[in-house]
C-alpha cells in the first residue's frame, strides 16, 4: 500500500515534537544548511571631538572639566585670554562662554552641557523620574550660585554691603541647610543615594562660590563637605586636580 500523503502543517503551526523550527525568513544568522552564522562583531563606539572654550579660570567650566576627567574623555581645553575674547565673542552662540564644541558644532548653557556630558559618562538616572531628582538638585545649586553672584558682582559698595547682610544671614544658611539635609537623606550623595552628576557638578562649582564669598562655605556643613571630598578623591578627577592650571578663581 502506498504511503498515505501527509498534509503540510498549517501556516504558523508549531513544529512537531523533536523537529527544529525553520529559521524565519530573513532571520539574522540563518545560513543554508541550518548552521548559525557567527554573531556580528560589536560596533566600535562612536568617538566625538570635543573642544571647551572658557577663560583661564575654574568658575562655570570646572564642572564640565570634572565630567570630562571622570569619563577619561579627551577634549581640547581652550583657555581664552581677555585680549583674545573681543575677536572671539561674535563667533559664540550667545556671545558668552563657556561654550562646548561637539564635532564642530558649538553649544552654550553650562547646565545643559553638563547634563549632556553626564549622559555620555553614565552619571544620569535610569528613568525620567531619577533624572528629575538630579535636575532638581543641580538647578537648586545653580539658583544658589546666582544669588551669590548678584551680590559678589554688585558694583556699588554701599548697595553691596546691604546685600551681603541678607546673603550671609538668610540666603546662604537657607540653601546650605537644605542641601546638607538632602545629602543626609541620600546616603552621602545629593541624589538617588549614589554618585550622579549632581555630586560632580557641586564639587566642581564649589571653589567658585567660595571665591565669591571669600570663605569656605562648607565648613559648617560636614555632609556637603563629604560630597566634595569624595568626588575630588575619585582617581580620574584627583589626577585632573593635580595637573590643572593653577588659577585664582
Curated annotation (Swiss-Prot):
Q: Name the UniProt key words of this record, in alphabetical order.
A: Detoxification, Transferase
- Entry keyword Transcription regulation: no
InterPro entries on file: Glutathione-S-Trfase_C-like (IPR010987), Glutathione-S-Trfase_C_sf (IPR036282), Glutathione_S-Trfase (IPR040079), Glutathione_S-Trfase_N (IPR004045), GST_C (IPR004046), GST_superfamily (IPR050213), Thioredoxin-like_sf (IPR036249)
The family this protein is said to belong to: Belongs to the GST superfamily. Sigma family.
List, for all copies, the residue spans of the domain called GST N-terminal: 48-125
User: GO cellular-component terms in the record?
Assistant: cytoplasm
Q: Does the keyword Ribosomal protein apply?
A: no
| One GO MF term attached to the UniProt entry | glutathione transferase activity
For this protein, the record's Pfam families field holds: GST_C_3, GST_N
Q: What is this protein called?
A: Glutathione S-transferase S1
Purpose of the protein = Conjugation of reduced glutathione to a wide number of exogenous and endogenous hydrophobic electrophiles. May be involved in the detoxification of metabolites produced during cellular division and morphogenesis.
Q: Which organism is it from?
A: Drosophila melanogaster (Fruit fly)
Domain called GST C-terminal: residue spans: 127-249
Q: Per UniProt, where does glutathione bind?
A: 54, 85, 89, 96-97, 109-110
The family database entries (Gene3D superfamilies) matched by this protein are listed as:
1.20.1050.10, Glutaredoxin (3.40.30.10)
Gene Ontology terms describing biological process: glutathione metabolic process
User: Where are the residues of the annotated region Disordered?
Assistant: 1-42
Residue ranges annotated as compositionally biased, kind Low complexity, are 1-38
**Catalyzed reaction equations:** RX + glutathione = an S-substituted glutathione + a halide anion + H(+)
| Complex and partners | Homodimer.
**Recorded name of the encoding gene:** GstS1
Q: What is its EC number?
A: 2.5.1.18
